[in-house]
């Protein structure tokens, strides 16, 4: 039985708003529907949410499900990084589609920096991530997968996620199972864990789904379960 990645990683939207402007952006639609901020193209920082990091029970957090790291002001990033350093019990994930706009170093042991790649023409983002973000951990999210990315240089990558389009627009996109399997095989050749999102079940079958997490995330989940006993 497949699991939902949202049950393993909690969203903490410290910044809401994005300047990238993807046509299929679910976050923009949600912000407009719930009137979270006035202008989605003008990101806003919510420092009060940083208190969530102080909880002692370990958690895996995605910090920018409704923003792109490239749109964060440097002072926002510095404040968040300092809070991450103070709370090593958690693991924190960041995502960007514009790694070419980033340029920083960090030695944070519990921060993971990733890019979204939806097609072969966007593979440059992986190279830009490694070049512009000098960090301990990298991940790549291949979602929604619009075409066959082909051969991918995954050197230095610590985790990949693979998924397809969801919602009403899913009828316009067809992710071939061969694309997901090719990415999986390439990752496994480098001992990189692969998490296929549950929306791939109709495409590859529930019995074939692969849902692997990095060891650091698994340790967090194990401690969570022990707290529930």
Q: What are the functions of these language-model segments?
A:
Residues 1-112, 120-134, 149-154:
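Conserved Radical SAM active-site core
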Residues 61-63, 92-94, 111-115, 138-142, ...:
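Hydrophobic faces of well-ordered beta-strands that scaffold small-molecule active sites
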Residues 67, 98-100, 117-119, 144-146, ...:
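Active-site-proximal loop/turn and secondary-structure-junction residues that shape catalytic pockets
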Residues 86-92, 134-137, 184-194:
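Structural alpha-beta junctions
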Residues 118, 122, 173-176:
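Short capping loops/turns at secondary-structure boundaries
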């Amino acid at each position: 039985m497949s699991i939902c990645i949202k049950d393993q990683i909690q969203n903490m939207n410290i910044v809401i708003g994005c300047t990238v402007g993807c046509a299929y952006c679910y976050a923009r639609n949600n912000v407009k529907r719930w009137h979270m901020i006035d202008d989605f193209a003008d990101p806003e920082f919510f420092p009060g949410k940083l208190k969530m990091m102080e909880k002692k029970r370990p958690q895996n957090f995605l910090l920018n499900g409704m923003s792109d790291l490239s749109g964060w002001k440097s002072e926002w990033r510095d404040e968040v990084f300092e809070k991450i350093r103070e709370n090593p019990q958690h693991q924190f994930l960041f995502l960007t589609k514009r790694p070419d706009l980033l340029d920083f170093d960090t030695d944070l042991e519990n921060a993971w920096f990733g890019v979204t790649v939806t097609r072969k023409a966007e593979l440059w983002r992986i190279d830009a991530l490694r070049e512009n973000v000098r960090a301990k951990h990298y991940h790549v999210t291949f979602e929604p997968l619009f075409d066959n990315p082909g051969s991918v240089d995954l050197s230095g990558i610590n985790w990949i996620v693979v998924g397809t389009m969801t919602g009403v627009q899913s009828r316009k996109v067809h992710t071939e199972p061969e694309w997901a399997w090719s990415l999986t095989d390439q990752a496994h050749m480098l001992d990189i864990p692969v998490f296929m999102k549950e929306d791939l079940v109709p495409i590859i079958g529930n019995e074939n789904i692969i849902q692997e997490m990095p060891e650091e995330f698994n340790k967090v989940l194990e401690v969570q379960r022990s707290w529930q006993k």
